């Protein structure tokens, strides 16, 4: 009975109703338009790849786009699209159909697939182009592209140039093999170099009318199928090695457990190989007779792919982060995706100009990678939403080096960034004054200028949400420390445009009275920096802050007393 309940639960969870939470909130017209556009894009990619050997998009983005199309078709019941291999169909029938392969999403899926299976083998999933090879009396006479799995195109014209492919067997036998033509690489580490467009390069070469000897020698062969070979995998591999295909045996490992599969997947992902790979293939050692094979995924073979180097992510929102100096940085908030075990929810575009050039809107699908294995990076827009949602962006001249010294409409982000810098390690180095604290004080109306916080007491601090009596006492201690900070540290906290190692001697009056020429006499200060310094000290907002600090008794800002001559 518990098994029946579990089956019923799994069935319910797989229904469209259960999946609805992840489905877009589109009306029927929009859903139809979005699906039609995605289908058209995929059809164009298929046509270029299968007919011209041109990959218009990275393989992993192609795969994820197909997954998205399948998901949308389930969400909105708009029917299914033609097979992506339809445009690959050719006139030449395969002696035995090429089976497909189911992709296992994670360790749990692999564990389920392996349950009850014995005699399982693991191989690298070579990232190339699948073919059928026909040998007669030991000589390679026919090379056929996978096509739709049943019919493909005749690539036999390339056989004379494929110097790295076994064209003459040591025995005069007739046999039919299936395998992968791949781009030969030296010491290729998939985890570091990625796919290197290896599959697309080989597809492009094979689509040509003629190859040069050098081009043909760049292509290798990995045999993974011998439909009419020995019944057991171990014997098939041994005979293939004797026939001139040693790599099949070298890169095939018998395994017993999920941990074995995970070990070899990780090993091949991070080891130097002569070809690009995009995962591992799991297959049972025994399989049905070749006469029963069909061009669809069978139960006895599956793929466990590597983590994506690029993730296809849906843009949920576009927000604009304003920094202390007025620099506007657009940030894309995306539906969470995973890259190398990192959960990505947002990615910076770097500049307002780049966002304007790319014109990214909510609903767009973008490619994201990791720069330096840690920082999310936008690669490009993959799909644009049919309906373009309006975005209100800051005007290019709204924020600059001397805007938003006070809290006002449209200024909160830059003003809080100024306060964060002031209290941070580059400024006064005040404990317990991070951006969250400043935001609470600003939103509570307790801090509206750069110096208001100097006048706060414990009672008023506790008016801000999340600030307890103890926290208020600790914050007051930090604020009191600020009063004794040196004059030059205060200037740097306010953002004076000068290098951290250059000296700032004197007081406010002396520095504010310097001309650009006088600033340039300081080693390390050129014409541009001197103009910025003059503008900083001359800004009315900065002068007002200096006056407030003088009134608060901060050293260096106070006007020195006049000496009276007797």
From Swiss-Prot:
UniProt-listed PROSITE patterns: DNA_LIGASE_N2
Q: Listed GO molecular functions?
A: DNA ligase (NAD+) activity
Keyword entries, A-Z: DNA damage, DNA repair, DNA replication, Ligase, NAD
UniProt catalytic activity:
NAD(+) + (deoxyribonucleotide)n-3'-hydroxyl + 5'-phospho-(deoxyribonucleotide)m = (deoxyribonucleotide)n+m + AMP + beta-nicotinamide D-nucleotide
* Enzyme class per UniProt: ligase
Signal peptide position in this chain? none
Active-site residues, as the UniProt record annotates them? 125 (n6-amp-lysine intermediate)
Q: Any idea of its EC number?
A: 6.5.1.2
> In its keyword annotation, does this UniProt entry include Acetylation?
no
Gene Ontology biological-process annotations: DNA repair; DNA replication
Read off the SUPFAM superfamilies from this record: DNA ligase/mRNA capping enzyme, catalytic domain, Nucleic acid-binding proteins, RuvA domain 2-like
Pfam families registered for this protein in UniProt? DNA_ligase_aden, DNA_ligase_OB
> Which branch of life, at top level?
Bacteria
Report if keyword Ligase is assigned.
yes
InterPro entries given in the database record: DNA_ligase, DNA_ligase_B, DNA_ligase_CS, DNAligase_adenylation, DNAligase_N, NA-bd_OB-fold, NAD_dep_DNA_ligaseB, NAD_DNA_ligase_OB
The protein's role, per its UniProt record: Catalyzes the formation of phosphodiester linkages between 5'-phosphoryl and 3'-hydroxyl groups in double-stranded DNA using NAD as a coenzyme and as the energy source for the reaction.
User: Which family is this sequence assigned to?
Assistant: Belongs to the NAD-dependent DNA ligase family. LigB subfamily.
Recorded protein name is DNA ligase B
- Species: Pseudomonas putida (strain ATCC 47054 / DSM 6125 / CFBP 8728 / NCIMB 11950 / KT2440)
């Amino acid at each position: 009975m518990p098994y029946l309940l579990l089956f019923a639960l799994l069935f319910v969870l797989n229904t469209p109703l259960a999946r609805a939470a992840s489905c877009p909130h589109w009306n029927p017209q929009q859903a139809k338009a979005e699906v039609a556009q995605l289908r058209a894009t995929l059809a164009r990619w298929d046509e270029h790849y299968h007919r011209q050997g041109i990959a218009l998009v990275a393989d992993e983005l192609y795969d994820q786009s197909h997954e998205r199309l399948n998901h949308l078709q389930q969400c909105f019941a708009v029917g299914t699209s033609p097979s992506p291999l339809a445009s690959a169909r050719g006139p030449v029938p395969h002696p035995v159909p090429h089976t497909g392969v189911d992709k296992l999403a994670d360790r749990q899926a692999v564990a389920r697939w392996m349950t009850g299976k014995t005699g399982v083998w693991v191989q690298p999933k070579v990232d190339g182009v699948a073919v059928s090879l026909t040998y007669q009396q030991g000589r390679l006479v026919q090379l056929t592209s996978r096509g739709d799995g049943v019919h493909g195109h005749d690539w036999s014209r390339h056989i004379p140039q494929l110097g790295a492919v076994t064209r003459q067997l040591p025995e005069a036998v007739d046999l039919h093999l299936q395998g992968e033509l791949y781009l030969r690489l030296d010491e290729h580490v998939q985890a570091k170099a990625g796919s290197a467009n290896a599959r697309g390069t080989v597809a492009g070469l094979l689509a040509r009318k003629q190859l040069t000897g050098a081009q043909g020698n760049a292509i290798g062969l990995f045999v993974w199928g011998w439909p009419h070979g020995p019944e057991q995998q171990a014997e098939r591999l041994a005979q293939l090695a004797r026939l001139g295909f040693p790599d099949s045996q070298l890169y095939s490992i018998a395994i017993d457990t999920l941990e074995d599969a995970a070990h070899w997947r990780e090993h091949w992902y991070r080891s130097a190989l002569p070809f690009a790979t995009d995962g591992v293939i799991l297959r049972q050692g025994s399989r049905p007779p070749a006469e029963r094979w069909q061009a669809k995924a069978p139960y006895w073979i599956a793929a466990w792919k590597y983590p994506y180097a690029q993730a296809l992510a849906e843009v949920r929102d576009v927000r604009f982060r304003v920094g202390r100096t007025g620099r506007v940085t657009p940030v894309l908030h995306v539906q969470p995706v995973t890259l190398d075990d990192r959960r990505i929810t947002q990615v910076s575009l770097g500049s307002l100009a780049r966002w304007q050039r790319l014109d990214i809107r909510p609903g767009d699908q973008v490619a994201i990678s990791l720069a330096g294995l840690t920082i999310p990076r936008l690669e490009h827009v993959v799909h644009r939403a049919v309906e373009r949602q309006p975005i209100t962006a800051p005007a290019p001249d709204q924020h600059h080096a001397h805007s938003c010294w006070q809290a006002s409409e449209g200024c909160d982000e830059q003003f809080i960034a100024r306060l964060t810098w002031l209290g941070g390690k580059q400024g006064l180095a005040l404990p317990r004054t991070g951006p969250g604290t400043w935001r609470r004080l600003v939103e509570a109306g307790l801090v509206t200028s750069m110096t208001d916080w100097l006048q706060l007491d414990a009672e008023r601090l506790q008016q801000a949400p999340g600030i307890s009596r103890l926290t208020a006492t600790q914050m007051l201690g930090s604020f009191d420390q600020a009063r004794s900070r040196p004059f030059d540290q205060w200037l740097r906290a306010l953002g004076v445009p000068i290098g951290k190692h250059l000296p700032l001697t004197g007081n406010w009056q002396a520095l504010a009275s310097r001309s650009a020429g006088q600033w340039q006499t300081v080693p390390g200060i050129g014409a541009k920096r001197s103009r910025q310094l003059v503008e900083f000290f001359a800004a009315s907002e900065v002068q007002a802050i200096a006056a407030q600090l003088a009134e608060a008794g901060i050293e260096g800002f106070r006007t020195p007393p006049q000496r009276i001559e007797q």
